[in-house]
Amino acid sequence: MVPKIKKRTFDVIIVGGGPAGLFGAYYLAENSNLDVLVIDKGKASLKRKCPIKDKGCIKCKPCNILCGIGGAGLFSDGKLNFIHKLGKTDLTQFMVETDARALIDETEVIFNRFGMDGKVFPTDIDQARQIRKEARKCGIDLLIIKQKHLGSDNLPNHIAAMADYIQGKGVVFHHSEEVYDIIVEKGCVVGLTTNRGQYFSNNIIIAPGRVGAEWIGSLARKNGIEVSQRGIEVGVRVEVHNEIMQDLCSVIYDPTFFVRTNRYDDQTRTFCTNFGGFVALENYQNFVCVNGHAYMDRKSNNTNFAFLSKVVLTDPVEDNQAYGESIGKLATLIGGGKPTLQRYGDLKRGRRSTWNRVRNSYIDPTLKNVTCGDIAMALPERILTNLVDGLEQLNQVIPGVANDETLLYAPEIKFFATQVDTDNNLETAIKGLYMAGDGPGVAGNIVSATATALIPAKKIISAAAETSSKKMKTK
């Protein structure tokens, strides 16, 4: 039963209850008396259950992996990368580097407050630098980042505790409610519309996460908000035996290697390494992708990581988002509605994999809801060439990652094609309309998403205090 809506007007409305939305709501609740509403089209964190283990993917609408309080990060393995510039994240777009570093430190304090703390990586900085030195001898760069790992099994309770605290401070949460559009009058935002009616506010933070990227693009076009194209990353999820990654991951939990390919001179990189982890399915309704995660207590015999090739379209086609979606749809078609799984040895030999060939290998795939096939039928030639070239180069630094038995799942696509144009407070050309997190392209991981939410929250509080001060003076 849908609860009756008692209040329609708020000081601040936040669209999305992922890391950005939660941290924005927390900061507003902790540092002001403003009325705040958080709207998410998914469920509360502890009610989000993916049926894939029992029934396979039944294409829940919305997907419980991607939507709901905690966002897509809820079912990640909780890798926290405390760095101001990584991948599509670059906080120096909005502030000087010293302030960007301080903002990241501020997020860590909040994470710690709600028990989201863990072992710090690298465990040995000198050893990490030596690994980077050896990689650079092979023409490969390694980014050394302060990291913590929380575990997929711990995240839901942490997020639920944070949401409960925020609600206790007076923030209102609406679950299973989808935002359609914003209401604008004379260049200022005054509210929004959802499947349950209209709400009114002069301050709206748009933070729907990666799954909302396409919606944000259409929202921007409809309301005349400028956007810029930043490209996408397309590739595979690589799965190897733990023994191949053990020495490396004991020092650097999530090593990020950058490899420049020989034929096309494109950048490929590793991302989201999960030692003892599991490959997971992501359902984007019109197509499927893969991802990976790891628990703190439950471990598999395998390690997985994303291996991605960067794509930036310019002329005549600039819509990187649409290009990525077309790849996702084609790959899903080839896989019969499922991701495609292939042994690396089969890919190199130009033949499709079969379950018999996979079973005869020593790596047992952690995601079974797949179709054994040929990734070469699903990914563009340039991307596939980059991935094979890059993996062979990476094998010089991590011997064994390019073995015949290595498993590849496709597609893995990181959508950050569109970045909404904002000022340094992440406010758009529409007064009172702010952006935060992965969806509008201003962040690319859990920590940076939370950091970008603090920026508009601080601006809103400052503006409210200034308005209050002016009213006091006129009395």
Model features per residue range: what roles?
Residues V2-G87, D126-K475:
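Residues forming the flavin
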Residues G68-F121:
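Dinucleotide-binding Rossmann-like beta1-alpha1 core, especially the glycine-rich loop
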